[in-house]
Amino acid sequence: MKSQVIAAVLLIAFCLCVVVTARMELQDVEDMENGFQKRRSCIDTIPKSRCTAFQCKHSMKYRLSFCRKTCGTC
């Protein structure tokens, strides 16, 4: 009886892991699709007068979708 309870708990834990992993994969796919749309519509908002090498290197409009600001020509 005790081994059946342990087996049932392990089976439930395994099923939960599978469900959580599947949800995370679906979320990653949705984030990639949304990120692609955001990258295409990324607009630079830093004026060229305030454009420095540090800002060009470190400023990002959408951090999660890897949409970098171009910061003009610097």
UniProtKB/Swiss-Prot annotation:
Main subcellular localisation: secreted
Location of the protein in the cell: Secreted; Nematocyst
Site (Important residue for binding Kv1.3/KCNA3): 46, 48, 50, 59-60, 62, 66
Intrachain disulfide bonds: 42-74, 51-67, 56-71
Propeptide section residues: 23-39
Cellular component GO terms, alphabetical: extracellular region; nematocyst
Domain ShKT per the UniProt entry, residue ranges: 42-74
Molecular function per GO: potassium channel regulator activity; toxin activity
Site for Key residue for binding both Kv1.2/KCNA2 and Kv1.3/KCNA3 (occludes the channel pore like a cork in a bottle), residues: 61
Keywords: Cleavage on pair of basic residues, Disulfide bond, Ion channel impairing toxin, Nematocyst, Neurotoxin, Potassium channel impairing toxin, Secreted, Signal, Toxin, Voltage-gated potassium channel impairing toxin
Signal peptide segment: 1-22
Family according to the record: Belongs to the sea anemone type 1 potassium channel toxin family. Type 1a subfamily.
Role this protein plays: Inhibits voltage-gated potassium channels (Kv) with higher potency for Kv1.1/KCNA1 and Kv1.3/KCNA3.
Official protein name in the record: Kappa-stichotoxin-Smt1a
Record organism: Stichodactyla mertensii (Merten's carpet sea anemone)
Lineage of origin: Eukaryota, Metazoa, Cnidaria, Anthozoa, Hexacorallia
